[in-house]
């Protein structure tokens, strides 16, 4: 049977497709990349800068998919120069028939030129991207780029400057091996925000590639001096890491579990694989006893699809169907019970879905969502058949998963009742807003701000100091709920979170509606100490787990109250950290320094001037650049196990600014 739970690694075999100059097709010329780089790499900020590396690595990965590459080496050199080397076949150097120039020159100078467009004459069966799109775009956005090819017993070299050839292709010597080495320097004219590469960002992506391509070895090395590194990655030492996972995506799921504070519900990671219509689908999953969340990562031709697509749809459909059918057949779900919903079936799951196919159809330039319709049926069939068989052969595991899902269903029903009770109560009350909410006069959400303030004392000062036209104040009281350890039904009974839910007006979880939000700026305002930071983290965990679109839309902020007040005569200045305090003390010798222990120590005028006045305040907008890392961080920080949290804090403490 093609779809089964297996323990041995299935390895792709090398294709016998020809790969020479005749296979390099030309679709259109390379134009406008430097004029509109965002169309090709998403942005010219840090994400676009790192995307250059991914494009070159993807070419090497495609060689691995075809069965010709086993080792990829990525090196960050001094000056933030990138070198990517592989032991694949080497880019063709013979003359491309249509243009009459070497194929490697075509690949690096012509947009949509490459050997990955499918068909019998293609150089590849499947590919993560269009061969020449990545190569030529990286070339266009580099100050300079050099490609060295080892092929047919010789080594060749071609150099480029800002996308244009800097001389002809040259044969520079003999070569005992095959492969391609690309070295490039991002153009600072294009990447004006930064040209500093982050080792950790590259490491995460390359580790994903290693998991998704079982047995392929990937090495990342950072040879830069600290002066060429981001400040928080300066260590004075060269860093290197080699990754190779024979277990493939099963190892990926295990790794994701190990990085979190989770206890597996069953010992074995389930793995299933199947083929159809020239595509291959792989799924690995495991449930966790102490998790109420789901983490589903999907990939198409090694490209992460954060917005999902047809492969995710097929997986979710099959998983829910199998659990319901098995539950009914075994009497775990009674006749009176409703079917499990999708979220019920996926509570506490970590799953990786990976498909590899010809002619992948991605929605959008950044390939965030897979659109091939037949993939839904393929993944659905693979998961349905394999999981049904697994449950029959492992009834104890199946029962444990069903019991967890039914508990989730009961909690969902309880949350629904609690939600309806809150609604009925609100409908009977003349004022539906929380009693302690001091609302603003303005009704246009795009102009209004909500300050969620810890404690009645600070809340009182904030109410007196605010601009009541646009600023609303909601003091929090009672015990804060850690939602990482609780299901949604407990939120509706929490006297600290429910006022927030009611004031915002959006609902939570599946019922969340961003169009109903009453404020477009939501500030968490807590004391600048350990307790305040804990409260802030609890609130951010709640927003991330149950009101995530607020963060995605850029509506959530953390207010930054000052730590110090310096006064000399009539001159008053505020410092927001120790370094600022030292600088101001040097500027104001003899100044009286007061250290604030809490927001309540400030009078209304001071709180307005330092923390709430749009003209003066220091704020931090909460952004999620990497949802997986955010999920991991919340799981570690707010979970039950102490050791992972201690390790996380020790690793990141030097970047924190806490009054301890």
PLM-predicted stretches and their roles:
Residues 40-48, 92-98, 303-310, 375, ...:
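Flexible beta-alpha connector loops of hexameric P-loop NTPases
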Residues 62-63, 90-91, 530-531:
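Residues immediately C-terminal
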Residues 35-54, 125:
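Conserved short strand/loop->alpha-helix "switch" segment adjacent to the catalytic nucleotide/phosphoryl-transfer site
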Residues 1-22, 30, 52-54, 62-64, ...:
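GHKL-family ATPase ATP-binding module
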Residues 410-429, 444-449, 460, 464-466, ...:
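C-terminal interaction appendages of subunits in large macromolecular complexes
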Residues 91-114:
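Short conserved segment of the HATPase_c
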């Amino acid at each position: 049977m093609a779809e089964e739970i297996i323990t041995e690694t299935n390895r792709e075999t090398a294709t016998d497709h020809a790969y020479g100059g005749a296979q390099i097709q030309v679709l259109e010329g390379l134009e406008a990349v430097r004029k509109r780089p965002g169309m090709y790499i998403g942005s010219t900020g840090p994400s676009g800068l790192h995307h250059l590396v991914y494009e070159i690595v993807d070419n090497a990965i495609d060689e691995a998919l075809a069965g010709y590459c086993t080792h990829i080496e990525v090196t960050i050199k001094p000056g933030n120069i990138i070198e990517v080397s592989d032991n694949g076949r080497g880019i063709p150097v013979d003359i491309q028939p249509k243009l009459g120039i070497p194929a490697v020159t075509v690949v690096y100078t012509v947009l949509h030129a490459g050997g990955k467009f499918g068909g019998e004459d293609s150089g590849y069966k499947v590919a993560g991207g269009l061969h020449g799109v990545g190569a030529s775009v990286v070339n266009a956005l580099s100050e300079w780029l050099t490609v060295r090819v080892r092929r047919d017993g010789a080594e060749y070299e071609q150099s480029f400057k800002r996308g244009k050839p800097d001389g002809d292709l040259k044969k520079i010597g003999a070569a005992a091996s095959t492969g391609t080495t690309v070295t490039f320097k991002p153009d600072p004219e294009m990447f004006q925000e930064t040209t500093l590469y982050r080792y950790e960002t590259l490491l995460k992506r390359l580790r994903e590639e290693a998991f998704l391509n079982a047995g392929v070895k990937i090495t990342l090395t950072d040879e830069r001096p600290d002066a060429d590194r981001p400040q928080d990655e300066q260590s004075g030492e060269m860093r290197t890491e080699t990754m190779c996972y024979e277990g493939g995506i099963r190892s990926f799921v295990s790794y994701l579990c190990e990085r979190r504070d989770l206890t597996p519900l069953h010992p074995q990671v389930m793995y299933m694989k199947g083929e159809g219509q020239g595509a291959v689908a792989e799924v690995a999953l495991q449930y966790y006893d102490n998790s109420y969340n789901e983490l589903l990562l999907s990939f198409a031709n090694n490209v992460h699809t954060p917005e999902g697509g047809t492969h995710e749809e097929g997986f979710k459909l099959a998983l829910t169907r199998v659990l319901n059918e098995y539950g009914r057949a075994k009497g775990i779900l009674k006749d009176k019970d409703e079917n499990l919903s999708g979220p019920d079936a996926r509570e506490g799951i970590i799953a990786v879905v990976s498909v590899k196919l010809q002619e992948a159809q991605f929605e959008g330039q950044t390939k965030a969502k897979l659109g091939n319709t037949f993939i839904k049926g393929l993944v659905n069939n693979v998961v349905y058949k394999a999981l049904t068989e697994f449950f029959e052969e492992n009834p104890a595991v199946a029962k444990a998963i069903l019991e967890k899902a039914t508990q989730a269903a009961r909690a969902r029903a309880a949350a629904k009742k609690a939600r309806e009770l809150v609604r009925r109560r609100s409908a009977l009350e003349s004022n539906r807003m929380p009693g302690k909410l001091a609302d603003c006069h303005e009704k246009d959400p795009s102009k209004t701000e909500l300050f969620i303030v810890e404690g009645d004392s600070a809340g009182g000062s904030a109410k007196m100091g605010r601009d009541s036209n646009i600023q609303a104040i909601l003091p929090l009281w009672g015990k804060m709920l850690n939602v990482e350890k609780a299901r949604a039904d407990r939120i509706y009974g929490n006297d600290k979170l429910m006022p927030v839910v009611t004031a915002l007006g959006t609902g939570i979880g599946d019922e969340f509606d961003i169009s109903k939000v009453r404020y477009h700026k939501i500030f968490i305002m807590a004391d600048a100490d350990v307790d305040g930071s804990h409260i802030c983290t609890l609130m951010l965990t709640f927003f991330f787990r149950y009101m995530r679109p607020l963060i995605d839309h850029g509506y959530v902020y953390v207010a930054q109250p000052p730590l110090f007040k310096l006064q000399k005569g009539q001159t008053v200045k505020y410092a927001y950290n120790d370094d600022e305090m030292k600088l101001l003390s040097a500027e104001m010798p003899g100044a009286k320094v007061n250290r604030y222990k809490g927001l309540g120590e400030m009078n209304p005028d001071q709180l307005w001037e330092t923390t709430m006045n749009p003209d003066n305040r220091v704020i931090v907008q909460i952004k999620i650049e990497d949802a997986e890392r955010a999920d991991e961080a919340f799981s570690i920080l707010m979970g039950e196990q102490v050791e992972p949290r201690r390790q996380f804090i020790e690793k990141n403490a030097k970047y924190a600014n806490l009054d301890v």
